[in-house]
Amino acid sequence: MSHPIQFVNANNSDKSHQLGGQYSIPQDLRENLQKEAARIGENEKDVLQEKMETRTVQNREDSYHKRRFDMKFEPDSDTQTVTSSENTQDAVVPRKRKSRWDVKGYEPPDESSTAVKENSDSALVNVEGIHDLMFFKPSDHKYFADVISKKPIDELNKDEKKERTLSMLLLKIKNGNTASRRTSMRILTDKAVTFGPEMIFNRLLPILLDRSLEDQERHLMIKTIDRVLYQLGDLTKPYVHKILVVAAPLLIDEDPMVRSTGQEIITNLSTVAGLKTILTVMRPDIENEDEYVRNVTSRAAAVVAKALGVNQLLPFINAACHSRKSWKARHTGIKIVQQIGILLGIGVLNHLTGLMSCIKDCLMDDHVPVRIVTAHTLSTLAENSYPYGIEVFNVVLEPLWKGIRSHRGKVLSSFLKAVGSMIPLMDPEYAGYYTTEAMRIIRREFDSPDDEMKKTILLVLQKCSAVESITPKFLREEIAPEFFQKFWVRRVALDRPLNKVVTYTTVTLAKKLGCSYTIDKLLTPLRDEAEPFRTMAVHAVTRTVNLLGTADLDERLETRLIDALLIAFQEQTNSDSIIFKGFGAVTVSLDIRMKPFLAPIVSTILNHLKHKTPLVRQHAADLCAILIPVIKNCHEFEMLNKLNIILYESLGEVYPEVLGSIINAMYCITSVMDLDKLQPPINQILPTLTPILRNKHRKVEVNTIKFVGLIGKLAPTYAPPKEWMRICFELLELLKSTNKEIRRSANATFGFIAEAIGPHDVLVALLNNLKVQERQLRVCTAVAIGIVAKVCGPYNVLPVIMNEYTTPETNVQNGVLKAMSFMFEYIGNMSKDYIYFITPLLEDALTDRDLVHRQTASNVITHLALNCSGTGHEDAFIHLMNLLIPNIFETSPHAIMRILEGLEALSQALGPGLFMNYIWAGLFHPAKNVRKAFWRVYNNMYVMYQDAMVPFYPVTPDNNEEYIEELDLVL
């Protein structure tokens, strides 16, 4: 808890007793500090308030992105009023000095301030007309004051009533529950023209610039703008600038979903308002003094170009890029071209010539920022044009090359990057020449201290190393030694972005240098004292070995590599998993060549399994699991048994992360060993695992269930049936887990256990679970019953669960139907043998008063009909059709979805002709709701059987033709 700062002389005591000189900070500064300290003391926030603050968009953005809150609309009376009131609130009020006569005794307040606040908030949320609100924030007072005002609606004029209605709709969209939000959004969309653009945008746009807005609220407000734009059409033209002020900053948001939403709004706006209006609005911002405004304007213009066509914008871009009035306009024009290249991707090829004519002259511009952004734009266009378009870039190669030889610093970096991006587009002979020349510059700039230059060198090096004329010999003699000397240093390891680029470049160079040479150069970093440097080296070794293998490593280099990796593993103190994953990648690649090194590695693992630090024990167990297949390939079965015994003795581990890794290692050993020779034996391991199933840690649960399932699959006879039943009851508890992977593993394990000890005992435990109230547990139990039926045969399960259906309890009957649904989905066309067997049960379910019964029975019919189509059971399906078709008038969304699925499946089993006989009469029924239900089914049939339905359309009798009634009969 922070406390207010206590200042010397803050209590205004008598100064006549001060012996020293009265030298201090200025009075106004001291008063400001005192006010700030008092504010901190009064407004201390608890943890929940701090978390709520971090959810706001403003608090998650950096200083650059926060600048969008400073953007202003065109000045009008409303904004001036708000600004003046804000300035009044923020003005420094002179502090009034108190005398001792002003001090009064304590007087109890008439009302509790907390109670007053709570009552006022609840009154706001429950006020008439806005009862569906979920919350009402303090910042909402500013934008929705007319909604919560006490003024009677009869005293309002027509426009004020309309404004209050609009505010209420916006408030429900922003703060309301889901149903209220959808209704309000639909009403606002339908009445957008009635409200008019002025009223809507003056209310809506300021909310989007509110600093306390959260992601969800911002998303809803932006969605509202998007919907309204379609309705208003041309009426939005006067408000294009205001909308862009809100929408353009979304294009630089960190969240890709927000960026795509911003693009969608600007696309719709440009379509509605037209090119002329958009460009007229953007024109002043092209040469704005603020770099932030120019940046978002360039991105918005690129979106407009994508929406309306790049060719439409080319004259405007060309004029901006060749502007003589302002270099900032040229800078923004070039940036528009860059953003077009990013947005269109390979589609920029069609417009490459026109865009190049706009920017080619800017490489020789007098202003450095213009030259830099031009080079970056050329680089972007070249990367997005790969592997085509070098003919267009020929015009800029000469000025680029001259610039590389004459420039230094950031300009050189950008020019070098542009040439490096064009090299992959060139023919091999030209690419070889430019690469050789570029390599001289790269070698010279290896010593550059500038991080931007370093990244550019690395990117160009990646592209140049792929050129055919650059030989492995040239790289080894001229580039690689200096590259490893300059870039493989500790300082680079601490810079994460540069670290990643260096690692990737090393792997790219390794394709030509070879695995042996690269590994040899990385051995020194692997043994370094600095852990980040070792971790960086392991990353590079892992990716190199995965890419190239270890076939060209000699015996000496293998020994040194394993030794270095073992040192890195032993010295590890952080939680990065790459160390043992890298170790695993090398061992898997070496395979049987690892045999001489297994003894010291396993010895290290055993020592680490007894280490006092949990993280060390966890890494040892993880490495052990990775090494198991290699140890097995080396036929070191005694070593596996020794490891298994040590791991078994460690099952009393108290740290769940470590215990999960130990169980996973034991699982790996059991999966590769001969179970007759496994030590300790399965009948000793399984009873130890059963109580561990109660551990609620996710990693422990997943690995334990997986291990038990493996034992049930490979060695069911090694444990007595009673032990398996104990495990069944433990697994039933795991079906309640919130983790999907755990529930899926538990269900699969039920199948293995049922196969091991027979379905009857397992079914007893599962059927008891159908009687519980918890829906998720009943659903998982139904899935488990379906799996048992698939493993042990439906003939073992169906009689039992059909008998269970006679229980007069809704939950049990629903569970049985759901189990049948999963079962028939799993067993496929085996279902055909049981159609007549379960028809009476489905008949009962489809005529039940409970909607969920009918819904689940429809699901059963869906799987039956799809799996048994064409098997000659049409009579049973017609019977089920007669029972299902009356349900098409249901209004519940979940139920009608399942019922329609069932009808579509029956149409597959019966054919469109027979099925459509049930539909024709309903299509022209006098009641609208009846027609609506049947037309919905007909539309689905029309999509599925458009051509097959033609012979079955009703034939009207014609006096001129002979009409044969028998052809309409279904035999």
Curated annotation (Swiss-Prot):
Q: What is this protein called?
A: U2 snRNP component HSH155
Q: How does it assemble?
A: Belongs to the CWC complex (or CEF1-associated complex), a spliceosome sub-complex reminiscent of a late-stage spliceosome composed of the U2, U5 and U6 snRNAs and at least BUD13, BUD31, BRR2, CDC40, CEF1, CLF1, CUS1, CWC2, CWC15, CWC21, CWC22, CWC23, CWC24, CWC25, CWC27, ECM2, HSH155, IST3, ISY1, LEA1, MSL1, NTC20, PRP8, PRP9, PRP11, PRP19, PRP21, PRP22, PRP45, PRP46, SLU7, SMB1, SMD1, SMD2, SMD3, SMX2, SMX3, SNT309, SNU114, SPP2, SYF1, SYF2, RSE1 and YJU2. Interacts with RDS3.
Q: Spans of HEAT repeats, please give.
A: 199-237, 273-310, 350-387, 513-550, 596-633, 680-717, 722-759, 792-829, 832-870
Function statement? Contacts pre-mRNA on both sides of the branch site early in spliceosome assembly.
Q: Where is this region: Disordered?
A: 1-22, 54-118
Cell compartments where the protein resides: Nucleus
| InterPro entries in alphabetical order | ARM-like, ARM-type_fold, PP2A/SF3B1-like_HEAT, SF3b_su1-like
Q: Which GO terms describe its cellular component?
A: catalytic step 2 spliceosome; nucleus; Prp19 complex; spliceosomal complex; U2 snRNP; U2-type prespliceosome; U2-type spliceosomal complex
Q: What else is known?
A: Present with 521 molecules/cell in log phase SD medium.
Which is one GO molecular function term here? mRNA binding
In terms of superkingdom, the source organism counts as: Eukaryota
Q: Is this entry keyworded Disulfide bond? A: no
Q: Where is the composition biased (Basic and acidic residues)?
A: 54-75
Similarity comment: family membership = Belongs to the SF3B1 family.
Key words, A-Z: mRNA processing, mRNA splicing, Nucleus, Repeat, Spliceosome
Q: Where is the composition biased (Polar residues)?
A: 8-22, 78-90
GO annotation (BP), single: U2-type prespliceosome assembly
